């Protein structure tokens, strides 16, 4: 399954592809050629590995959540600690890879989109380290929710550009980032933050994020002597999940992706693209998306700024269609409860995104036996969510 996906046209089965205007095709082809050369160059791979170790702080630990495992009384729960990567989330794994590629291709400016701000921070961090200019597009609504991350990006030397159109969230920031890239492709590299967009982005981001699953596979073998029974990760665009799942695709391991059910799947306020969406094209790729009868994209909703994307990576769409990965959805309330439980029992405050995966993992672990194990991708830490959490836990969740 692994080596042939995507095919040479960037297709994961019927999903993926390159649905871009002619004006972008030369930039995409230049990226494809640059990426192909870099990934077989030992010097590039060596530099990437060194930066991941010395700068990002890899490998990240695997933590046995012993208190929660005992409390729930079912399977043993293990956490892959991407929250401990420099800048606080898995996003830096990919940003370092693409940043080094941009430099190698002779680009001196990075442009990115961001939702929760974590990818924007990661891109600004890499730009700073590589001596490049950085412009980050961010929806106005997300800028309000993630004020601290906006300041972090500015402190790192990036210009944060507000996206004022549409729902003023991640989708709109992505549209504006692409628009900017079209007219500045000669000296600018577009650093996409998830496994979305036209080929080769979904494949490239997956390959930079698979370090999560590669490490976890080895760590689980060392710690438990075998593979986990179940792996759970949250899915917005889906890069932490693909990074975790990819090395396990050919193994007998249950894989569960968790989308944001927001205020409930029976309401209009959710971001559960695979659970409730249909096929369509968004940001250069054929995938599942949230759209109305006339093909207009619906506004997604989640308390988590990193999960309210109306599409999903095409490889996730393919894995759902193949029934290799099961996609579930968790409400705001369930995620917030799981977050509080992890903080109280294990002394770890996860990002609200990651708490969606935790909620599903806790539900599943209860139904399993103590000789089974559940591995959760703890994709980020909760520092960025403190304002939201303080409001919700003090004033109550507004349903």
UniProtKB/Swiss-Prot annotation:
Family (UniProt): Belongs to the TrpB family.
CDD domains xref list: Trp-synth_B
Catalytic activity: (1S,2R)-1-C-(indol-3-yl)glycerol 3-phosphate + L-serine = D-glyceraldehyde 3-phosphate + L-tryptophan + H2O
EC class (word): lyase
Subunit structure comment from the entry: Tetramer of two alpha and two beta chains.
Swiss-Prot/TrEMBL keywords: Amino-acid biosynthesis, Aromatic amino acid biosynthesis, Lyase, Pyridoxal phosphate, Tryptophan biosynthesis
The enzyme's E.C. designation: 4.2.1.20
Keyword RNA-binding: no
Gene: trpB
InterPro entries: Trp_synth_b_CS, Trp_synth_beta, Trp_synth_beta/beta-like, TrpB-like_PALP, TrpB-like_PALP_sf
Pathway entry: Amino-acid biosynthesis; L-tryptophan biosynthesis; L-tryptophan from chorismate: step 5/5
Modification sites for N6-(pyridoxal phosphate)lysine: 91
SUPFAM superfamilies documented for this protein: Tryptophan synthase beta subunit-like PLP-dependent enzymes
Function: The beta subunit is responsible for the synthesis of L-tryptophan from indole and L-serine.
GO molecular function: tryptophan synthase activity
Pfam family, one: PALP
One cellular-component annotation, GO: cytoplasm
This protein's name: Tryptophan synthase beta chain
Cofactor(s) listed in the protein's UniProt record: pyridoxal 5'-phosphate
Taxonomic source organism: Shouchella clausii (strain KSM-K16) (Alkalihalobacillus clausii)
Domain of life where this protein originates: Bacteria
